[in-house]
């Protein structure tokens, strides 16, 4: 298995190092044709506007969208979450191009500026169930985004409480409002939808590799599913062309 890491800007080296600790090869991706050589892709944290401009300059967006549509596993961290979202608010004037595919609305820099970056322990029940370890994960939030709402097919993996004076989002008016703020509410910071995984924080900046392990297993499951589907299709075609021979049970053709 080879995992690609988009290497335009940001913490791509840290992701590759985390993969290496798990015995998985990570390769830097800077050109569209390099996506053909990898099983899955990580879009790292960084400065999302800069990353988008570089991706546009290298004409990467069409290839990235096709990679997602093909069902290839993609994990976005921080800026990568913004890339994968279908909708984004709080962007700079003119906005930025998105890859899309994740049915959610994300708020860029929801938690504030660089000096408001922080670390916090977040509950991660599904991660703990699959990977073991502590019930919490140390999230590193650097100018971090947050997911404001999700579609019905999106699974929420982690959320984080925000204080009562934090500005909230109203999806009905597509505006930022605080008039209906609750004493305490939660925003979503990790999600999964099909072949897409996204975290608002930076797992690559910690020694805890459980999120990377989770993504590797997710990649293997998707690859095995695709291989199984392909095998059944090949067997089915063979039976159709065999004419009057009796139908045979589906058998694995790759050992």
Swiss-Prot record:
UniProt-annotated catalytic positions: 78 (nucleophile), 202 (charge relay system), 204 (charge relay system)
Name the positions where L-glutamine binds: 46-48, 108, 142-143
Chief location bin: cytoplasm
Q: Would the keyword Lyase be found if you checked this record's keyword annotation?
A: yes
- After gene disruption, what is the outcome? Embryonic lethality when homozygous.
InterPro entries noted in UniProt? Class_I_gatase-like (IPR029062), PdxT/SNO (IPR002161), PdxT/SNO_CS (IPR021196)
Describe which pathway this protein belongs to, using the record's wording: Cofactor biosynthesis; pyridoxal 5'-phosphate biosynthesis
Q: What is its EC number?
A: 4.3.3.6, 3.5.1.2
**What GO molecular function terms would the record report?**
glutaminase activity; protein heterodimerization activity; pyridoxal 5'-phosphate synthase (glutamine hydrolysing) activity
Give the catalysed reaction(s), semicolon-separated.
Answer: aldehydo-D-ribose 5-phosphate + D-glyceraldehyde 3-phosphate + L-glutamine = pyridoxal 5'-phosphate + L-glutamate + phosphate + 3 H2O + H(+); L-glutamine + H2O = L-glutamate + NH4(+)
**Hydrolase keyword on record:** yes
Q: Where are the transmembrane segments?
A: none
- What biological processes does GO assign it? pyridoxal phosphate biosynthetic process; vitamin B6 biosynthetic process
Task performed by this protein: Catalyzes the hydrolysis of glutamine to glutamate and ammonia as part of the biosynthesis of pyridoxal 5'-phosphate. The resulting ammonia molecule is channeled to the active site of PDX1. Involved in the indirect resistance to singlet oxygen-generating photosensitizers.
Q: What extra comment accompanies this record? A: In plants, synthesis of vitamin B6 does not involve deoxyxylulose 5-phosphate but utilizes intermediates from the pentose phosphate pathway and from glycolysis.
Q: What HAMAP family does the record tag this protein with? A: PdxT
Per the similarity annotation, which family is this? Belongs to the glutaminase PdxT/SNO family.
Question: What NCBIfam families does the annotation carry?
Answer: PLP_synth_Pdx2
Q: Oligomeric state and partners?
A: Interacts with PDX1.1 or PDX1.3, but not with PDX1.2. Binds to RPA2A.
What is this protein called in UniProt? Answer: Probable pyridoxal 5'-phosphate synthase subunit PDX2
